[in-house]
């Protein structure tokens, strides 16, 4: 994203593919990633995932980075400590997703100023919860940006089941954006 002065904001999005801690959270279905779970994750495997993710962060070198498929704030903090390129600030909310999968945003406070954040609750047509859409309003070089970090319901369980869920999520996001644009037709929005 470039300003009129030519200065750019480096923005990215990354699916970190199930960045989970090793503890079994009894309130979610995360046990396959816990120690002793079906995925056979060990401390060494977890540490290697953090190391590899930190290397990707270095390659991306983003000022603002949306992430999906993170379990909680703890793993984001661990990732931030494994990466020594920047001291990112973390925006994360625990969502009601049954598997404990959340969205998050990392940002460099030296470059991007956060004004407001909120999770947008995403209730599916059959009433079941899924991960929230993360909304972040921030400022860069005098420009107000509206960022929506989202990871729509997966095709896990088949496309026939997934399509109505994904459509509902698309409608929710479209309504949020329409409301933002009705208040400010020139709003700068990133998805």
Regions found by a protein language model. Name each.
Residues 25, 140-183:
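Metal-dependent phosphoester/phosphodiester hydrolase catalytic core
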Residues 64, 70-144, 148, 152-153:
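Structured beta-strand-rich core segments of catalytic domains in phosphoester-bond hydrolases
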Residues 181-191:
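Metal-dependent active-site segment of extracytoplasmic phospho-/sulfohydrolases and closely related
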């Amino acid at each position: 994203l470039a300003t009129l002065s030519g200065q750019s904001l480096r923005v990215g999005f990354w699916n970190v593919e199930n960045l989970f801690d090793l503890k079994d959270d009894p309130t979610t279905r995360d046990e396959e990633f816990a120690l002793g779970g079906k995925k056979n994750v060990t401390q060494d495997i977890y540490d290697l995932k953090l190391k590899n993710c930190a290397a990707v962060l270095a390659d991306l070198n983003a000022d603002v980075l949306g992430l999906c498929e993170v379990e909680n704030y703890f793993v984001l903090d661990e990732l931030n400590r494994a990466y020594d390129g920047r001291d990112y600030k973390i925006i994360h909310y625990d969502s009601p997703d049954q598997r404990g999968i959340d969205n998050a945003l990392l940002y460099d406070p030296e470059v991007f100023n956060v004004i407001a954040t909120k999770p947008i609750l995403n209730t599916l047509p059959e009433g079941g919860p899924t991960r929230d859409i993360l909304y972040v309003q921030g400022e860069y070089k005098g420009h107000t940006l509206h960022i929506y970090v989202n990871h729509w319901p997966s095709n896990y369980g088949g496309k026939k089941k997934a399509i109505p869920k994904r459509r509902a999520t698309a409608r929710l996001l479209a309504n949020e954006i329409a409301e933002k644009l009705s208040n400010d037709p020139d709003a700068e929005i990133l998805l």
